[in-house]
Amino acid sequence: MNINELKTKAMQRKPASKRASQTGKKLDLSKMVRMNFNENSYGMSPKALEVIKESAVMGNRYDFNATEIKDVIAKKHGFDSSNVLIGAGSSALIDMLGVTFLEDGDEVVLCMPTFAAFVDMAYVNGATPKVVPVNENQEFDLEAMLEAIDEKTKMVVVVNPNNPTSTYRSAGDIEEFIKKVPENVMIVVDEAYLEYATAPDCKSMIHLVKEMDKPIVILKTFSKIYGMAGVRMGYAIADSEIIASMSGCPAAWNVSIMAQKAAIAALNDQEFIEYVKENIVKGREYITKELEQLGCKVFPSQTSFVYFDAHRNPAKLMDEMAKENIAMGAAEYSRISVGPMEENQLFIEAMKKILGR
């Protein structure tokens, strides 16, 4: 039986996904310090955890519309609920974007390296990723992206701050970029890590959904600062016509009652969110300082991870770190998630050992 022949042509030509792939070796993460997937080691709000337990009794009931969580999110950002779409993580929303708006012959302009889900989105739906390298500062090269747009371009994607490079482009830069994108090209801005940013000019573009007459989609997730990666919860903010179109996807009905209730509780527990952010920022600064003292080049981070050049092969460093029972990530350079201080210190001690310092 040749299953490959049964696949769609788009899936046959799609390269292997890099989503969640961190090493060629299979690791038993249960025995390791997990610093490879940008997970929030502080977990979710205790209030959210309690609500999950309480709402489990409703797990036998459908919730077709997710009305309550949509209303809460809409109020938080100053929109109507018709501007909000809920998904099982922002990854599900990315998939919905592709199913709704992409087809054979379309191109998606984006920088690399970035979140691999966007590359998958293009290929799965018959489109082609038109890749522009990040600039020398490991930032999205917005200027080169504009030059790459042509008559085949259906969508442009900006991840800000970017994963895996941890860098950002200023609100002013992104707004100018959006102004210059042709009106028939959809603009997707993924703000998964924005809540970790401390730079004054690293801001959300949500307001542009109202202010500009352009097809702008803003993606948000509960997987990062809200610590709900395993719960699967995210949302999109866009013009109501875009939301209505995406709502026609089968995947638009994919979020459990427990996830919705937990998300509401998490949004209402800002004290816990501030606690997480404060500790992640401290850990980020600690790792940055220690790596620089070890002679590594560290790219300024506005996220929950640090991207750095240890002047050695990133895949080799990742495997060496695995021998120290620490799981880390790699792209063109190395990436380490920021955790509680004891985890950060274990990572630095392992780096000193590996680098012979």
Task: Mark where each language-model region is.
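Conserved PLP-binding catalytic core of the aspartate aminotransferase-like
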Residues: 280-281, 290-324, 338
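PLP-dependent aminotransferase-like
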Residues: 100-158
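Active-site pre-lysine segment of PLP-dependent enzymes
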Residues: 142-151, 164-187, 191-223
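PLP-dependent enzyme catalytic core of the Aspartate aminotransferase-like
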Residues: 320-323, 327, 331-357
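Phosphate-binding glycine-rich loop
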Residues: 66-107, 125
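N-terminal "arm"/small-domain region of PLP-dependent enzymes with the aminotransferase-like
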Residues: 1-60
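PLP-dependent aminotransferase class I/II
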Residues: 45, 215-292, 297-299
